[in-house]
Amino acid sequence: MAGAPSWLRGAQSETTRSSEPRGVLFVCTGNICRSAFADMYLRDRLRALGGVGVPVSSAGIMAVVGHDLDSQMAAEARAIGLSGSGHSARQLTGRILRDAALVVVFGPEHVEWIASEFPEHLVRTVALGQAASALRHSAARVPLREVAGEVQSADPDPSDSEWIADPYRRGPEAARVAAQRIRSDVGILLDTISWPV
C-alpha cells in the first residue's frame, strides 16, 4: 500500500485500529444472571475510574433474548448501588465475539459452546475465577489484549473452584454467593489489568 495517497493510508490504518478487538465480553447461559451482573458491575467500576475507554458487554449461549436482569441478581445489583435494570439479554454470535479482546465465561459449558461454534475465539477466552487466580499476585499490570494469553499460560485448566455456579431460580442465597464471587473476581481484574484510556 506504499503507493497509495497519504489520506488513504491514514484512513486504512484508522479502520484497522478501530476494528481490532478491544472490549471485555462476559458470557454465561441465559445472559440474565452472571454475565449481565458482571457487565453492569465492571462498567460501573470503570466509570468510577474516570471513564476508561473499554467497551464492556455480555451475551448468552442460550440467551433469554430481550429479558432484563434476573430479579434475584437485580436485588444484588441494587444492594451495591447499581440500577439493576435496563439490561436486554442477547444471544452470543461470532460478530459479538470478534469485538472482544477478552472473553470471560463462568462455567465449562460456555467454553465448550465457544469451542464448538467459534473455536477461533478460544485464544481470548478465560473463566472469571481462572483469571482472578492467575492475576491475583501479578507483579505488574497486564495489558488488556495480553490477559487471556497470560491467564492461559499460568492456569491452563480452570479448577472446579474457579467456576461460578448459575444462580438462576436457586433463590436469594445462590444469587448473593454468585454476586459476591463476581464482585471479588472482577475487583482483581480491575486492579491487575492495564486498562486502555
What are these regions (language model features)?
Residues 1-197:
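Short polar/charged helix/loop
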